[in-house]
Amino acid sequence: MKNERHVLIVFPHPDDESYCVAGTILAYTQRNVPLTYVCLTLGEMGRAMGNPPFATRESLYAIREKELKRATNILGIKDLRMMGYRDKTLEFETPGELRRVIQKCVEELNPSLVISFYPGYAVHPDHDATGEAVAEALATIPENKRPTFYAVAFANNHEAEIGPPHVKNEVKEYVPKKLEALQAHASQFATKVTELKREYEDGVTETVEWLEREPFWIYPFKDKNK
């Protein structure tokens, strides 16, 4: 992984950062690369309440905020920005609202790399709305000044439609911390982390690949095809 001037990560929910890009985050923060994480909601409408349940619909908001702060501390993120949008409603925000928020962050931080979801290939409506807003915000920047957009994709049909990933970050050395960050999101991954650890120790191919390598697609802005 090359050094970056500043890395901006934009995801909609607490745990997206730990589930999708924890190793990549650690690779940057442990080299003291400036990194900002913009989390648009606190995932308060999530269905998971812990296993066994310890959260309620009323308490989940505060619990997930604490989990997010714990996880980002583990990942070495010093600049966490919680934007306070309502979970599961991002697709219904006023047109241009999310784009403007992201534009302001880009103008302030001048990142060389932005990481978010690949719009249309990230399964959840909030994921797709976030990725679309990031793409729209970055598209307003002239190509020679635009940061690279690393997009995360995992819809069932994604490789058939957008091809194999352009980048696969090798993050084996960060697996223990990656699992620790996931464990911090206890309301969402209480039993999953135990299962992942067991599968990793047993050498389950899919789990080893998921924990040790993080794939990204470089988002294709239309002006690149001119």
Swiss-Prot record:
Domain of life of the organism encoding this protein: Bacteria
Keyword tags: Hydrolase, Metal-binding, Zinc
GO MF annotations, alphabetized: hydrolase activity, acting on carbon-nitrogen (but not peptide) bonds, in linear amides; metal ion binding
Gene name as annotated: bshB2
Binding annotation for Zn(2+): 13, 16, 127
Keyword Magnesium found: no
PANTHER family: N-ACETYL-ALPHA-D-GLUCOSAMINYL L-MALATE DEACETYLASE 2-RELATED, N-ACETYLGLUCOSAMINYL-PHOSPHATIDYLINOSITOL DE-N-ACETYLASE-RELATED
Protein name per Swiss-Prot or TrEMBL: Probable N-acetyl-alpha-D-glucosaminyl L-malate deacetylase 2
Catalysed conversion reaction: (S)-malyl N-acetyl-alpha-D-glucosaminide + H2O = (S)-malyl alpha-D-glucosaminide + acetate
Role summary: Involved in bacillithiol (BSH) biosynthesis. Catalyzes the second step of the pathway, the deacetylation of N-acetylglucosaminylmalate (GlcNAc-Mal) to glucosamine malate (GlcN-Mal). Could also be involved in bacillithiol-detoxifying pathways through formation of S-mercapturic adducts.
Organism: Bacillus anthracis
Family of the protein in this entry: Belongs to the PIGL family.
Top EC category: hydrolase
Cofactor: Zn(2+)
EC assignment: 3.5.1.-
